[in-house]
Amino acid sequence: MQFSAAFLATILSATTVFAAPAPAGEAVSMMAKGPQWTIQGLNRKCDTADKTCTWNFKINTGAAAATSCTYVVKSAKATPKASRSNGGPSKCGDFTITSGWSGQFGEGNGFTTLSVVSNSKKQIVWPAYTDKQLAGGKTVKPDQAYAPAALP
């Protein structure tokens, strides 16, 4: 009898230790409803001195005709070069574009992340491209698609 009472007490205490934690509160998904946005035909061409880089692409939200965009990033100093500079804001139709370069993965592994905001829909995507994808001004293939997030 003593064994079974001790065993039962152990089992009951163990169940409280392993009980699921209480939820911390509800979270709201910030992902927008609707289709992914596709960045079409993107290329970045920099001048020989790397003081100006011109990005050309189309933003296709899947809800209307694609919006053509020419986005220019300039470097006023010798460093960082335009290909490694932050840029914007710049307007392309209903969209506002900004960008930031990162070298966090080491030399030769840099990448640029664009912020593409639909001002009317209050939605955003963050297309990102490696320096290798953008090298030589070639068009990135295949096109890349991103799920938009809703801005608060």
Describe every region a protein language model picked out.
Residues 25-78:
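Short, surface-exposed binding/anchoring microloops in extracellular/periplasmic proteins
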Residues 8, 46-49, 104, 123:
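A broad, structure-centric signal for solvent-exposed, well-ordered loop/edge residues
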Residues 17, 60-62, 117-122:
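Short, flexible beta-strand-to-coil junctions
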Residues 4, 11, 31, 49, ...:
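A generic structural signal for short, solvent-exposed coil/turn residues
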Residues 80-152:
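Acidic, low-complexity intrinsically disordered segments
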Residues 1-26:
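Fungal secretory targeting signals
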